[in-house]
């Protein structure tokens, strides 16, 4: 029996088989794909420059072949100059916690992952509008997993994005994507987004469509997706959104001030023209989450909205709080409500929603022990219920400009000691 652990109790609500997890990619990892080794057992590559490319750069380390662990001898801002970082070589761990304060922030572009077996931790990604005119067509994601456009390429899989901060994207802040009509193997699968800040998607900005503040898109057919313990703040919608046949566990997240939709599903007839008979419903397991409405939230908005009833939804212990702490509707759109949990990540125990929100505010984002001014401001705005939608990073202080820092890393000679060494950079609370 697959067990759906909640509040420390083992609730026998599911029926699919589950095996005990292998060694996780880092201590405490939960979700799907966490058995990936990432770069474990490979070479250690040290980032020694904040340049956007060239020798010693993060771009060079990500492009290297073979298993690799990327660590940082420098801290500060990496200006990507409108050229996204590509991770198309598998088996990599990016350990942002190894950077000296203030850590690593990527600006003026984001990350794209088409590889498998990727672990990314403790980075900030803040693409922004690059000073371009509104509706000019600049539409970067913060981070997106996607399927490479090569013959037979399968979708990215076994990917863990943990304790990162994603803000100011013009398309989605953080997404799992792929090919729409090629089947499940050709889109993202076994992907976990955990303990991230996903906030302030730019609204009336440079996207050609105009308003486009989006949190997370889970693409058609993406399966075994875990969205756990994240802070979604001040994104118009997609907090997250699932497309047809996508399947995700959405647990212990705090969603603040969605301006149109919080959790929802979406599809349009143009994308499925001639293929409606093949369209399968999305499946959402929504447990222990909290909605806090804000200045931009419409009063009639439900926490979960299902377009045209095309979804199966399991709901448990979600808090939906409007002005003055009054509850708002949990679900709208007439989905099929499941009485039993259809799937659940092995070994994961959700917190009660009444505890999860505070946990998220304390622990989410890159380097929660060493938050930058942007993350501090976002979290403070959530706590005070004053955070609002923005159209440009210039409304909230602009791109960060910390002084570059440097330190010396002493990488253990014993490969067996590397995991403990990487964790030693994270203060234990």
Question: What would you call each of these model-derived segments?
Answer:
Residues 51-53, 75-77, 98-101, 294-297, ...:
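Acidic glycine-/aspartate-rich tracts in secreted/extracellular proteins
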Residues 242-397, 403, 411:
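Extracellular beta-rich repeat passengers
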Residues 127, 168, 200, 233-234, ...:
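Residues in short coils/turns that link rungs of repeat/solenoid architectures in beta-rich domains
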Residues 79-224:
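Right-handed parallel beta-helix
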Residues 18-22:
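Boundary at the C-terminal end of the N-terminal hydrophobic targeting segment
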Residues 5-16:
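Bacterial N-terminal signal peptides
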Residues 26-70:
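Acidic Gly/Asp/Thr-rich repetitive segments characteristic of extracellular carbohydrate-active
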